[in-house]
């Protein structure tokens, strides 16, 4: 089976598919940015994904196929992240600048998010953890399914 478009997202309408048998394509976040790939479901079914250029990244809960009784969805593995809880705008700016110098991407969340606070989240890196410890910025290391994948930051001088 070749998947050429995303049919929706399970998280946006969970009740609509409650009676469907769910088959999962389990992916690390690094593969969410690939629009052409071969995958295998947790039931051993092989699928080809060939999404058109300009299609957004895959997301947790994306529906790849559906019929009257079955649904195949993307299930994203948790990512090892640092949840940074800067106490002031100055502290956040200094940390964000340091992450930018390392060409690390960060995602930002407000108090209404699942984090319950204004936080900055980046992929785990031991040098960033050492930096946060040395400057005394509060953080937690967690495993999280991120809403969008971290992308490799291109860089030139």
From Swiss-Prot:
Q: Does the keyword Chaperone apply?
A: yes
Under Gene3D superfamilies, the record lists: Urease metallochaperone UreE, N-terminal domain, UreE, C-terminal domain
Which is a Gene Ontology cellular component entry for this protein?
cytoplasm
Q: What is the organism field in this record?
A: Paenarthrobacter aurescens (strain TC1)
Can you say where in the cell this protein is located? Cytoplasm
What InterPro entries is this protein classified in?
A: UreE (IPR012406), UreE_C_dom (IPR007864), UreE_N (IPR004029), UreE_N_sf (IPR036118)
Q: Its domain of life?
A: Bacteria
What's the protein name?
A: Urease accessory protein UreE
Q: Which NCBIfam families match?
A: PRK13261.2-3
In terms of Pfam families, this protein maps to:
UreE_C, UreE_N
Free-text function comment from the UniProt entry: Involved in urease metallocenter assembly. Binds nickel. Probably functions as a nickel donor during metallocenter assembly.
Name the encoding gene, please.
Answer: ureE
